[in-house]
């Protein structure tokens, strides 16, 4: 039989090992990882927050509803971009309900972009994302919205009594698209842009040109 002293020694060793593992896995590794993340990529470590004039307006990782015509539109959302929730449509893809929903998404996209034909619209632009909060759209999905966005920015400037040149607005929007372009998988992946990045860039442009006031962001 195992003696009491031997049993206590085994228990003591087990406790020591457990404490060491807890310290390493639960304290040291998270602390070191957090320290590295904060110093290497502070923005991502904090959830890629959208910071405008010192205030947080969400995250670049979560799509929001930008209903004005001078903003790029994200993919449709079954949860109405409710950031306290997440989810896709409940209906199966081959049901009448799903077909009707897709048809409505097409009509809405064509209403917002009357110069775009159905064949130009990437399929994902008329399909709800799995989370309902996907901020990424294909590059083509941004390009076909570009004409509407540019003209709407110019029109908004005219309403505010500020004349913007087509060249300046075009260049700004093009630069936003190009600087946001990423590939979801090296070499063979598809190219996409982050709608939140584009629309925050537009907000900054409008604020800098005194077309939108900072107070209107609240």
What are these regions (language model features)?
Residues 1-2:
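N-terminal leader/signal peptides at the extreme start of proteins
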Residues 5-43:
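Internal alpha-helical transmembrane segments
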Residues 17-18, 88, 92, 188:
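Active-site oxyanion-binding pockets that recognize sulfate/phosphate
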Residues 26, 33-145, 149-152, 156-162, ...:
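Flexible, solvent-exposed loop/hinge segments and secondary-structure transition points
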Residues 148-218:
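Extracytoplasmic/periplasmic C-terminal soluble domains
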């Amino acid at each position: 039989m195992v003696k009491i002293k031997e049993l206590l020694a085994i228990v003591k060793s087990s406790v020591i090992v457990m404490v060491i593992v807890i310290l390493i896995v639960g304290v040291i590794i998270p602390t070191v990882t957090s320290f590295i993340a904060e110093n290497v990529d502070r923005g991502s470590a904090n959830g890629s927050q959208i910071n405008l004039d010192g205030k947080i307006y969400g995250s670049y990782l979560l799509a929001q509803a930008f209903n004005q015509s001078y903003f790029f539109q994200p993919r449709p959302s079954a949860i109405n971009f409710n950031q306290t929730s997440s989810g896709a449509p409940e209906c199966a893809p081959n049901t009448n309900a799903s077909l009707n929903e897709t048809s409505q998404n097409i009509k809405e996209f064509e209403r917002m972009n009357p110069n775009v034909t159905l064949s130009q619209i990437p399929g994902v632009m008329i399909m709800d994302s799995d989370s309902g909060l996907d901020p990424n759209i294909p590059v083509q999905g941004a390009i076909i919205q570009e004409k509407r966005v540019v003209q709407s920015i110019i029109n908004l400037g005219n309403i505010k009594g500020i004349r913007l040149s087509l060249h300046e607005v075009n260049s700004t929007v093009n630069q936003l698209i190009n600087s946001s372009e990423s590939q979801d998988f090296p070499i063979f992946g598809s190219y996409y842009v982050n709608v939140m990045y584009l629309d925050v860039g537009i907000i900054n442009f409008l604020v800098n040109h005194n077309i939108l006031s900072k107070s209107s962001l609240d």
